A protein has these predicted regions:
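Intrinsically disordered, low-complexity regulatory segments of kinases
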Residues: 1-390
Length: 390
């Protein structure tokens, strides 16, 4: 039975800066564009709710990402729509293996309301995110062979974005990589659950808020890169503060120009996270929930060594944190850390040596010498046959 007032915030209501007027009041059973029937809620985020739908024209399941109403300058919603339209044009021009691992829009339309339009992005339904997958493994450590499979394919996706589309994702993380569904069985299960036990929304000032249905966890090893709200063209030059805190490339940290190499960096940091179940960098003041720039710099130096003098001399932060010779002069002190010690899930020996060579091609201060997707895809550690020992 619907309630007139929720005792506790539910799903999107619990997000910071939530305003009910910004979310479209979706109801199960709604038919959008005279074509897409809403079956059940799959998830939510700061800029959208996501629903399982049925496409009456193609007779297939569809994922319906119904975005908040946001027409402000720099809106991630408008940016994602523009980027998806651009990706679709490139996808039609030429085939590329990266298309298999990139979530493209099948349809984009807007729903008109008295307060303004809401975009709806239609895509092929996918499984849970890698972040959700981490939660089912002990200590959030994924099997090494699964990590190799995921990371290799992500580099193929990124190669298409960079080389063909001229676009930088900028927000690659386990949350923004979904697992491909091998078939529709889990979607049929959700529809059956909804039929037998219909979702009842909590009503808040006339706005329905539904609980999400869980999607199937797949171990196919096929990742689908998604969420393009923070995507940027490589031109004109980017040099503003960007990227997620735990995956931020050093050139962004140093307020230098940045481009395609930031995505390579993010995948490298993510590789370590999936193998070890923890983040390489944690420059967050947990008491105040704030990112601490000097703490980040100190941690980067701890794992990567001091940045090249010719790099940091270009940074506006140079004399704030370093002396004229490039020595660290700030607090906190440089932590005693090494990649060798951080990596514990690969035993010492030839394979660990190969992995450290792989990761050091990626985690570099200088983006100019950081491996590109083309250079890293054939790497020995990444491509070593699964049944062949080092």
């Amino acid at each position: 039975m619907a309630s007139s007032g929720a005792a506790r915030p539910l799903e999107e209501q619990s997000l910071p800066f939530y305003h009910r007027k910004h979310y479209y009041p979706v109801r199960t059973g709604d038919v959008l564009k005279d074509r897409y029937r809403v079956i059940a809620k799959l998830g939510y985020g700061a800029y959208s709710t996501v629903w399982l739908g049925w496409d009456d024209r193609s007779k297939q399941y569809a994922s319906l990402k119904i975005c908040i109403r946001d027409d402000t300058k720099g809106s991630p919603v408008l940016n994602e729509v523009a980027m998806l339209q651009r990706l679709s044009r490139f996808a039609q021009e030429a085939d590329h293996p990266g298309l298999e691992f990139t979530r493209l829009a099948q349809d984009i339309f807007h729903i008109d309301t008295p307060t303004g339009p809401h975009y709806c992005i239609v895509t092929k339904p996918q499984g849970a995110s890698i972040r959700t997958l981490q939660e089912v493994f002990p200590d959030a450590v994924l099997p090494k062979l699964l990590v190799k499979s995921l990371i290799h394919r992500l580099f193929v996706s990124v190669n298409w974005l960079h080389a063909t589309c001229g676009l930088i994702h900028t927000d690659i993380s386990p949350q923004n990589v979904l697992m491909d569904l091998e078939d529709d069985s889990s979607l049929k299960d959700i529809e059956e659950q909804e039929s037998q036990d219909p979702s009842t929304p909590i009503m808040s000032q006339g706005i329905p808020i539904y609980r999400s249905r869980a999607t199937m966890l797949e171990l196919s090893g096929i990742p689908i890169l998604t969420d393009f709200g923070q995507m940027r063209p490589a031109q004109p030059e980017n040099r503003d503060w960007w990227m997620s805190d735990l995956y931020r490339a050093p050139e962004v940290l140093l307020q230098l120009p940045w481009s395609f190499p930031v995505d390579i960096w993010s995948i490298g940091v993510m590789t370590l996270e999936l193998l070890e179940g923890k983040n390489l960098f944690d420059p967050i003041d947990r008491t105040n929930d704030q990112y601490v720039l000097p703490l980040a710099l100190a941690q980067y130096i701890g794992y990567l060594g001091p940045p090249p003098l010719e790099i940091i001399k270009q940074s506006p932060l140079f004399l704030t944190y370093f002396d004229e010779k490039g020595n660290w002069i700030s607090d906190p002190p440089i932590p005693q850390a090494s990649l060798e010690d951080f990596v514990t899930t690969i035993s010492p020996g030839k394979e660990k040596d190969a992995f450290l060579r792989f990761i050091r091609k990626i985690l570099t201060w200088d983006p100019e010498i950081r491996a590109t997707s083309v250079e890293i895809i054939p790497d020995e550690w990444l491509m070593k046959p699964w049944d062949e020992k080092f």
